[in-house]
Amino acid sequence: MNDNRSGGEGLQRKLSPLNVWALALGSIIGWGAFVMPANTFLPNAGPLGTLIAMAAGAIIMVVIALNYSYMINHFPVAGGEFTFTNASFGPTCGFLCAWFLGLSYLAIVPLNATALALIGRNLFPNLTQWGYLYSVEGYSIYAGEILLAIIALVLFAVFSIRGVSVAGKFQTVLALSLVGCVFLLAIAALFSPHASASHLAPAFTTDATGKSSLGGILAVVAVAPWAFVGFDSIPQASEEFNFSHKKSLVIMVLSILFGGALYVILNTITAAVLPEGYTSWVP
C-alpha cells in the first residue's frame, strides 16, 4: 500500500512518537488505576500478587501489540480494528466490528467523564455537590457533578476539533503530568510517617486454609484487558503518524510497560500508606 500523502489526500501527519505514546498511556490510565487498588487488586491478590498479575497481563498485551504492529505496517491508515477486519474478512465482518467498537467507546466515554464527579465528590464536595436531582441504588446524583462532566467533554471535544496537532500536544502534557504526579506521590509516600514496608504483609491473599490464593491472582489477570485498554488507540491513529510505522511496536510496548508500572506503583502506595488505626492493608 502506498504510504505517501499529498495535497488534500488522507489525514494530517502531525503526531510525533511522543504524542502517540502519550495518547496510548493516557487511554490506559484512567479512573480505574486510582479506584481498583482498594476494591479489586488488593482484596483479590495482595500487593505482590497484583505485581505478578499485572506483569502477566502486560506480557499478554505485548503479544496483542505484536499483532497490531503487523497489521499497522500492512494497513497504515486510520480505522484500526475496523480497517483490519474490513480488509481481511470483508464488509460484513467490518460492519459488525465497527458497531461493536462504536458501542464499546460509547460506553467508555461517559464512564470516564462521570468519574470526574467521583473525584470531585471526594476532593471538593462543596463545589460539585449541589442541585440534587435523583438517586440510583442509594447513590445521589447532583447537577454540579453532571455539569463538571459536561464541561470536561466539551473541553476535550474543542481540542479534538482544533486538529490532531493541538490534541496531540494537549494529550502529551496531560500524560507527562500524570506520570510526574504519580512518581511524586511515590516519593512522598517513601517519606510519609504512615508508610512502612511492614504494611505490605501479607504479600498475597490467602484462602480458608491459609495458603496463598492463585485464584486471586488469576482474577486480577482476568481484568488486565480492561486495565490496559487504550494502547489500541495507536492503530486507529496510524494514518496521522509523522514517523515510520515500524516504530509503532516500540511505542505500544512502552505504553504498556509504563501503564503496568503506574498500576503497580499506585497499588503498592495504597497498601503501604495506611491511615491511623490500621496496621495492614487487609480489610
Role assignments for model-derived ranges:
Residues L25, I29, I52, A56-I60, ...:
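Lipid-exposed faces of alpha-helical membrane segments in multi-pass integral membrane proteins
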Residues Q12, A33-Y139, S255-A261, I265:
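Extracellular loop-to-transmembrane helix junctions
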Residues V63, N67, A107, L111, ...:
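Residue-level signal for alpha-helical transmembrane segments in multi-pass membrane proteins
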Residues L11, Y70-I72, L96-C97, I151-S177, ...:
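Membrane-water interface regions at transmembrane-helix termini and the short interhelical loops
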Residues P17-M36:
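The first (N-terminal) embedded transmembrane alpha-helix
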Residues S6-Q12, T50-L51, L127-G144, T172-P283:
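Helix-loop-helix junctions that connect adjacent transmembrane segments
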Residues N73, V77-A87, G94, K169-T172, ...:
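Short amphipathic alpha-helical coupling elements at transmembrane boundaries
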